[in-house]
Amino acid sequence: MSTGTVVQVIGAVVDVEFPQDAVPQVYDALKITGEGSCNGLVLEVQQQLGGGVVRTIAMGTSDGLRRGLEVVNSGSPISVPVGTATLGRIMNVLGDPIDEAGAIGEEERYVIHRAAPSYEEQSNTTELLETGIKVIDLVCPFAKGGKVGLFGGAGVGKTVNMMELINNIAKAHSGLSVFAGVGERTREGNDFYYEMKDSGVLDKVAMVYGQMNEPPGNRLRVALTGLTMAEKFRDEGRDVLLFVDNIYRYTLAGTEVSALLGRMPSAVGYQPTLAEEMGVLQERITSTKTGSITSVQAVYVPADDLTDPSPATTFAHLDATVVLSRQIASLGIYPAVDPLDSTSRQLDPLVVGQEHYDVANGVQTVLQRYKELKDIIAILGMDELSDDDKMTVSRARKIERFLSQPFHVAEVFTGSPGKYVSLKDTIRGFKGILSGEFDHIPEQAFYMVGSIDEAVEKANKKK
């Protein structure tokens, strides 16, 4: 437990001098002691500058910090509470409670910097995880123990989609969930807490928040805090769900920290260590022979450009990608998932079965053909198309509308009750549209319904 003194403060970067024979290691947690508002502030060592000086990043606001303050080295990285005591609680990056409900009362703490499971320890499964959302279950099915990314620009519905997934999976799935709010709005964190409380699953969820107003060091580490809690549940042999909103803010916090530490930026101004930082986080989100972590991560796409280095680096780590499109959202079709851009490794006849694979493929083929015909329709109109193409367009428009669905979490905005559609009903519905069974039903009947039976009922009512 060596002590040092603050020698320089530049925003969130703090240099601390220690005796030459007791210099802290990289990632060690240091604590400011003494009077004033900064008492108890935690710093994380990022670099050793030589001469006993270490460069650190503050995990809280550095307002009121000054040179000469005493700093104590804890001798280990930041550690956070793990285990069942964290369930139903809201914590910050350090694992301290921020829900005003008393101490966590944990029996064990884990350090947030841990090695990823070795190749021998990892396990993979082809078991599907039903989400109850038609477009996802059909075109980009999730695997239990897999990694899923929700990609989308600003305001196309990433958080709403994630909330619906939590609502459908966390309630139906009796396991435990960990929610890491990384650099997102405090209001959304608040909404999530009450959503979980009202639906009675709060005692199965641990929540870790490092929101937009926090310093970059805090936002950079909060994903690791949430992951550490999930790892503990996995190592106890449980199946755990990890929700991260938003991975892009994790990257952005890394960019801020990198700039503060004086590193030369790389492509588009991102940190040179972008791929490595992403790998450190993503490689730990994995399933072992003991238990599984199924993760759903929201990924903000800057300026709707999927080739931006941040989303592009994330793509490589995922088993399924759900791409949200602004064009589809502008048509009023929600969830605004692009069925032609979204992918899943599970969409294989050996995994999902031949029928599911053929229906998904058929849907994508019809939509792709419709996309190609749109230019001809815009210039020459529908009358110039062949009968086959007219039928393709008609079915494609029905499929487009049938891919929409009312959400439980959006009931308060839309006024229509949310629908959970089983995979069996989803396949039956789309198979019927492709085969021409519902050619006589107007396309409006397919908009914002659950199963195909509701669409038929809606059409009969309109007659």
From Swiss-Prot:
Localization per Swiss-Prot or TrEMBL: Cell inner membrane
CDD domains per record: ATP-synt_F1_beta_C, ATP-synt_F1_beta_N, F1-ATPase_beta_CD
Keyword Translocase part of the UniProt annotation: yes
InterPro entries documented for this protein: AAA+_ATPase (IPR003593), ATP-synt_VA_C (IPR055190), ATP_synth_F1_bsu (IPR005722), ATPase_a/bsu_AS (IPR020003), ATPase_alpha/beta_chains (IPR050053), ATPase_F1/V1/A1_a/bsu_N (IPR004100), ATPase_F1/V1/A1_a/bsu_N_sf (IPR036121), ATPase_F1/V1/A1_a/bsu_nucl-bd (IPR000194)
Membrane topology, record value: Peripheral membrane protein
GO molecular function, one term: ATP binding
Chief localization: membrane
Reactions catalysed, as given in the entry: ATP + H2O + 4 H(+)(in) = ADP + phosphate + 5 H(+)(out)
Xref: Pfam families: ATP-synt_ab (PF00006), ATP-synt_ab_N (PF02874), ATP-synt_VA_C (PF22919)
SUPFAM superfamilies: C-terminal domain of alpha and beta subunits of F1 ATP synthase, N-terminal domain of alpha and beta subunits of F1 ATP synthase, P-loop containing nucleoside triphosphate hydrolases
UniProt superkingdom: Bacteria
Keyword line: ATP synthesis, ATP-binding, Cell inner membrane, Cell membrane, CF(1), Hydrogen ion transport, Ion transport, Membrane, Nucleotide-binding, Translocase, Transport
Subunit (UniProt): F-type ATPases have 2 components, CF(1) - the catalytic core - and CF(0) - the membrane proton channel. CF(1) has five subunits: alpha(3), beta(3), gamma(1), delta(1), epsilon(1). CF(0) has three main subunits: a(1), b(2) and c(9-12). The alpha and beta chains form an alternating ring which encloses part of the gamma chain. CF(1) is attached to CF(0) by a central stalk formed by the gamma and epsilon chains, while a peripheral stalk is formed by the delta and b chains.
NCBIfam families reported in the protein's UniProt record: atpD (TIGR01039)
Annotated family: Belongs to the ATPase alpha/beta chains family.
This protein's name: ATP synthase subunit beta
Organism: Shewanella oneidensis (strain ATCC 700550 / JCM 31522 / CIP 106686 / LMG 19005 / NCIMB 14063 / MR-1)
Gene from which the chain derives: atpD
